[in-house]
Structure formats: structure tokens, C-alpha cells
Design a protein with these regions (language model features):
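Extracellular/oxidizing-compartment recognition motifs
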Residues: 1-83, 91-92, 108-117, 123-134
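Well-ordered alpha-helical scaffold segments within catalytic/enzyme domains
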Residues: 95-106
């Protein structure tokens, strides 16, 4: 939210997203953490599998994997949401797809991605590109 003409307005970016752990705000005073809201963006899918152990460290690791999947499943499977590598890398997709299919119903997500891959293969003479879509 910002105020420039006397009226409060919310800022919600519609054409970009950022992955982050910390946010630094500068140039303003009298702000607190309660003045900000983070928003998790990810493709909609239903969770289908879960694991719970008696070890809190292992449970945290599993939670990190689940949130990592959410972080990287926004229209295409990416390898990291915080840098300019927010693209559908086919190698990363191949490595994580088994885990993803265990954790969630990924049928619609991967069907769309594999259709995009098929379209790229038509252009590339049947070769699988490193990134889909290119």
C-alpha cells in the first residue's frame, strides 16, 4: 500500500513475482512487520501424499520439500523462484517429477507442461530443449 495523492492504494504486481527470504525496506520510517503481507503464488494442485515421522528435523525437511515444490510450480516447473532462472528447465523437471507426483495430483500441471514440450520439439526437429517454453 502507498499514499501519493492522499488516498491509500495497494500494490500487487500482476506480471512478475519474486522468491525471497528477507525483505529490506529503506527510505521510510515508522514501519513494522505488520505493515507488510507476503503472498505465496503457485499453481493449484491437490496434495495426495504425506509423510510424518517422530523426528522434527526430518518433518521440517519434508515441509521444506513441499514448500519448495509450491515455490517452483507456477505455470511451469522452475528450479528456483528468486533469480532469473524462473524457467521450465527440463532437467530439473525430470529429477523432481517422481517426488512431485507422490506429493500431489500433478496430472493437469504436467499435461500442460508436456504439451508445451511437444510443441517445442516440433520446432527443434524432435530434440528436447533445455528450457520449455523457449
Amino acid at each position: 500500500m502507498y499514499i501519493s495523492d492522499g488516498e491509500e492504494k495497494d500494490i500487487v504486481p500482476h506480471f512478475t513475482f519474486y522468491g525471497y527470504r528477507y525483505v529490506k525496506i529503506s527510505g521510510v520510517t515508522n514501519v513494522s512487520c505488520e505493515d507488510f503481507t507476503g503472498m505465496a503464488l503457485y499453481s493449484d494442485y491437490e496434495g495426495t501424499g504425506s509423510i510424518q515421522t517422530g523426528n522434527e528435523l526430518v518433518n521440517q525437511l519434508i515441509s521444506n520439500v513441499e514448500w519448495g515444490m509450491k515455490d517452483n510450480f507456477l505455470d511451469v516447473p522452475t528450479d528456483c523462484p528468486q533469480r532469473d532462472e524462473r524457467m521450465g528447465w527440463t532437467g530439473d523437471t525430470q529429477v523432481f517429477s517422481g517426488t512431485a507426483c507422490y506429493l500431489a495430483d500433478t496430472y493437469a500441471f504436467y499435461r500442460k507442461y508436456l504439451y508445451d514440450l511437444y510443441k517445442e520439439q516440433l520446432i527443434a526437429g524432435g530434440m528436447v530443449p533445455e528450457v520449455v517454453p523457449t
